[in-house]
């Protein structure tokens, strides 16, 4: 009897271990030899497990994107036994069990097309635990519906109507910079511009900016927390899908003890919860779609402009489930986070390049005199600034209708998303050279398991920065050369524009590009005409890409671009 009991105990102990070992062995065999992706070149360890990728992300300072570039070179030619010849396979490499990465500038527009259904990689989508937001939406059809509700707010006419709000934020930031400069301490442009961009987005979203630009040291603690929050999200993509929702639902002290970066999420939760209690209370005061008649939302009444989320929660075009508090909070958080980070990168890099190249700054100032005769002149209108060729020369035949020569150059080399643009071709296979890339599956985002079977998805990705530093298109690509964009015929300009994709393209392209451009065109002329700025303890490495923290980030020890502020000689 005792022997039977001991045997049963041993069976209970060893059976799960044996089952796990068999499952692991079977999964390894499938991924290496039987998977539809097994035929594609790439390291076997990457095909076997995502731990290969996570090693470079977690332990090599988020530098998997450069490792991928090395893999393309390593697998540039492969011997094909059937034909006894070498085939050029470098442009396509398997970088994890589910994903193929392609390095070919002509394929980018096939992968980022408006045609067909494109799901998002579930591993990337769940990293910030905001499946209700546009950026966290996996399913193509749901994403299209949510994006369609947001896009009208970023039309050129809507941005022109917001011009006075942006100008008010520009004036406030310049006042803060002037006051800070009087202390004799250098201003951190990265933090200051991030406060400005976040305040603009907050004001447009819900008539409450948050007042980051008013805080001492330009909210340096909040800015550091936000950066750490982005990195925490990147780490989360390698954890089970249930991890982030559980952590976000836990008490604040537990979140902070698990990851100090969770403090950033906690701050945002408190602000957004309070905000949406106010919004939904206001919603009860009047009929759907008639926000202007509600009298108990004093922030909206005082704002004097339409706001995105007041309109969204009362939109007759969205079903009730799309207007729930939880989803709208997630949408707001994603929008503020994305709008502040990316715009501040462009502003910081642009101002640094101007200060490091006095001849370019001098030429820009000379052009600005046509609309700003002196430092005390009234601010020009956005339309006036958009007409300046050196600052904002319209690019022909481009969706970037108002991306200027200088801004374009900065955006291409030093800003935008450094992370891979990942797409799941849901309804059809893709074809690249002689390769057939199998389609993914159609599945609702709520029931796609993160540890799904390998047939559940085929992720196809490209890294935009590889296109933007292609020396065949841009000789000496890291040099600050505005003249490369001047005096071009249409064919030459189109060739340069083809690789210019800092904000992505297609159905998943940046929704807020028009707002971001308006912020840039209005703030940068103000900075270079109202002040004489002098670099302090800063160099090019403080703006160059070094770390993939979703957006590009400079080296980890960078303190940002700092400047001394002096009275303008403009």
UniProtKB/Swiss-Prot annotation:
GO terms for molecular function: heme binding; iron ion binding; monooxygenase activity; oxidoreductase activity, acting on paired donors, with incorporation or reduction of molecular oxygen. The keyword Glycoprotein applies. Heme binds at residue 510. Its EC number is 1.-.-.-. Its main location: membrane. It is an enzyme of class 1 (oxidoreductase). It is found in: Membrane. Glycans are attached at residue 191. The keyword Iron applies. GO terms for cellular component: membrane. Its cofactor is heme. The chain crosses the membrane at residues 9-29. InterPro entries: Cyt_P450 (IPR001128), Cyt_P450_E_grp-I (IPR002401), Cyt_P450_sf (IPR036396), Cytochrome_P450_monoxygenase (IPR050121). Pathway: Secondary metabolite biosynthesis. Keywords: Glycoprotein, Iron, Membrane, Metal-binding, Monooxygenase, Oxidoreductase, Transmembrane, Transmembrane helix. Non-reducing polyketide synthase; part of the gene cluster that mediates the biosynthesis of orcinol depsidone grayanic acid (GRA), the only major secondary metabolite known in C.grayi. The first step consists in the ring and depside synthesis by PKS16 leading to 4-O-demethylsphaerophorin, involving different orcinol-like rings, one with acetyl CoA and the other with octanoyl CoA as the starter. Further depsidone formation by the GRA cluster-specific cytochrome P450 leads to 4-O-demethylgrayanic acid. Belongs to the cytochrome P450 family. PANTHER family: CYTOCHROME P450, N-ACETYLTRYPTOPHAN 6-HYDROXYLASE IVOC-RELATED. This is Grayanic acid biosynthesis cluster cytochrome P450 monooxygenase. It comes from Cladonia grayi. The gene is P450.
């Amino acid at each position: 009897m005792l022997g039977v009991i001991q045997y049963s105990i041993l069976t209970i102990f060893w059976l799960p271990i044996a089952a796990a070992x068999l499952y692991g062995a079977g999964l390894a065999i499938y991924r290496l030899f039987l998977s539809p992706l097994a035929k594609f070149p790439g390291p076997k360890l990457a095909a076997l497990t995502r731990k290969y990728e996570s090693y470079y992300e977690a332990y090599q300072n988020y530098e998997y994107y450069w490792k991928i570039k090395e893999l393309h070179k390593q697998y540039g030619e492969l011997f094909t036994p059937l034909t006894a010849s070498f085939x050029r396979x470098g442009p396509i490499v398997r970088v994890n069990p589910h994903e193929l990465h392609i390095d070919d500038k002509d394929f980018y527009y096939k992968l980022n097309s408006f045609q067909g259904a494109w799901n998002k990689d579930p591993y990337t989508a769940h990293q910030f635990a905001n499946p209700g937001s546009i950026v966290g939406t996996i399913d193509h059809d749901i994403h299209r519906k949510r994006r369609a509700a947001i896009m009208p707010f970023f039309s050129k006419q809507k941005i022109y109507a917001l011009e006075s709000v942006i100008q008010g934020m520009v004036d406030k930031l310049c006042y803060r910079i002037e006051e800070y400069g009087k202390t004799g301490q250098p201003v951190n442009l990265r933090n200051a511009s991030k406060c400005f961009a976040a305040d603009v987005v907050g004001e447009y979203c819900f008539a409450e900016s948050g007042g980051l630009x008013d805080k001492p040291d330009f909210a340096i603690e909040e800015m550091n927390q936000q950066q750490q929050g982005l990195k925490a999200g990147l780490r989360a993509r390698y954890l089970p899908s249930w991890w982030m929702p559980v952590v976000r639902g836990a008490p604040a002290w537990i979140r902070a003890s698990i990851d100090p970066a969770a403090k950033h999420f906690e701050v945002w939760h408190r602000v957004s919860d309070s905000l949406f209690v106010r919004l939904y209370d206001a919603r009860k005061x009047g009929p759907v779609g008639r926000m202007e008649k509600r009298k108990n939302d004093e922030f909206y009444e005082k704002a004097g402009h339409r706001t995105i989320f007041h309109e969204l929660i009362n939109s007759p075009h969205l079903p009730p489930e799309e207007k729930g508090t939880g989803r709208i909070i997630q949408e707001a958080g994603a929008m503020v986070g994305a709008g502040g980070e990316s715009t501040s990168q462009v502003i910081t890099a642009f101002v640094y390049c101007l200060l490091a190249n006095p001849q370019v700054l001098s030429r820009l100032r000379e052009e600005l005199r046509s609309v700003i005769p002196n430092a005390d002149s009234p601010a020009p209108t956005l339309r006036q600034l958009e007409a300046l060729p050196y600052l904002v020369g319209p690019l022909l035949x481009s969706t970037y209708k108002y991306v200027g020569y200088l801004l374009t150059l900065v955006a291409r080399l030093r800003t935008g998303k450094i992370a891979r643009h990942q797409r799941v071709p849901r309804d059809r296979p893709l074809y690249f050279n002689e390769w057939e890339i199998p389609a993914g599956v159609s599945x609702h985002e709520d029931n796609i398991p993160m540890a799904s079977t390998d047939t559940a998805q085929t992720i196809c990705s490209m890294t935009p920065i590889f296109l933007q530093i292609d020396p065949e298109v841009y000789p000496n690509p890291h040099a600050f050369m505005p003249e490369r964009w001047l005096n071009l015929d249409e064919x030459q300009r189109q060739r340069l524009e083809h690789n210019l994709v800092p904000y992505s393209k297609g159905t998943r392209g940046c929704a807020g590009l028009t707002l971001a451009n308006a912020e840039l065109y209005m703030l940068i002329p103000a900075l270079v005409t109202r002040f004489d700025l002098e670099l302090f303890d800063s160099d090019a490495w403080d703006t160059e890409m070094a770390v993939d923290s979703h957006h590009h980030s400079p080296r980890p020890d960078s303190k940002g671009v700092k400047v001394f502020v002096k009275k303008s000689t403009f």
